[in-house]
Design a protein with these regions (language model features):
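Short linker/helix segments within small regulatory modules
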Residues: 63-75
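Short cysteine-rich clusters marking metal-coordination/redox-active sites
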Residues: 47-51, 78
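Cys/His-rich metal-chelating microdomains
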Residues: 50-53, 84
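Short, non-ligating residues that shape and space the ligands of small metal-coordination modules
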Residues: 54-60, 87
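Eukaryote-specific, cytoplasm-facing alpha-helical/coiled-coil scaffolding segments in long proteins
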Residues: 101-110
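N-terminal alpha-helical interaction blocks
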Residues: 1-41, 110-231
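Short metal-binding segments enriched for Cys and/or His
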Residues: 75-97
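Short metal-coordination and nucleic-acid-contact micro-motifs, chiefly zinc-binding Cys/His arrays
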Residues: 40-44, 71-74
Length: 231
């Protein structure tokens, strides 16, 4: 555990409680982010996980679909805090783990944007120098907003608490890509072309190829035909 996270409170199981976690009746609910702290994190440049001051670089813990659209709900963290979360968080580290929805407070606002509720099986620590926030109002959450991450200076893929290999990442992308593809189709040809471009950019940050293991084809609509996410 990073030293800067050692001052965090722990729950009854002994797990450190990240700074962003919502507390109810004196107990942390790891499923819910504190929306006040979410705003403080971006306006005061606080680490999403430890609450300390961020420096020049920001590390986002995101899933493979967020790597494609470069959009996330969660503010950035220190690099070492983000890596610890990617390796130690039960939901992120265990591909078959599921979020518990039972008993969620009724006053919790729905997530902004298109939520991908499945566990992708891999996560990515996306390290950048910049990000910006933009408004995403919905009928249920008129003050909703999301974060667009800047170009990465470093990317680190993880699965099962260790560095992920290329095939694991590609398989995770294949599970979520149909959702983005259908959303792009509804928005029209320009959105489909933008998606193809975004997928091509993700290809450049995949883990290295595995000896003797070909990449699976991940095809989306592109200008003049189709584009496959392959090396």
């Amino acid at each position: 555990m990073p030293a800067r996270m050692s001052a965090l409170p722990v729950d009854e199981r002994g797990y450190p409680v990240p700074w962003f976690v919502h507390w109810s009746d004196g107990k942390p609910d790891f499923r819910i982010m504190d929306n006040v702290k979410r705003a403080v994190a971006v306006t005061q440049r606080k680490c999403w996980l430890c609450g300390g001051q961020l420096g020049r670089f920001q590390a986002f813990v995101i899933g493979p679909m967020c790597a494609i659209n470069r959009v996330t709900q969660e503010p950035p963290s220190h690099k070492d805090c983000a890596i610890y979360a990617a390796m130690a968080c039960p939901f992120l580290a265990r591909p078959h783990a599921k979020r518990r929805e039972a008993g969620l407070p009724e006053n919790i606002a729905p997530d902004n944007g298109i939520a991908l509720l499945h566990n992708p099986g891999v996560c990515l620590v996306w390290i950048a120098r910049s990000f910006f926030c933009y408004s995403v109002p919905t009928p249920d959450n008129p003050r909703g907003w999301l974060i667009k991450v800047g170009d990465p200076v470093e990317t680190l893929w993880y699965a099962e608490g260790r560095p992920a290999n290329r095939l694991e990442v590609l398989e995770a992308i294949s599970r979520g890509l149909p959702i983005l593809t259908e959303a792009a189709k509804l928005q029209g040809r320009e959105a489909e072309l933008e998606l193809a471009k975004a997928i091509d950019q993700v290809r450049r940050i995949l883990p290295p190829p595995l000896d003797g293991v070909p990449d699976p084809d991940l095809v989306t609509v592109g200008e003049g035909g189709t584009n496959a996410l392959k090396s």
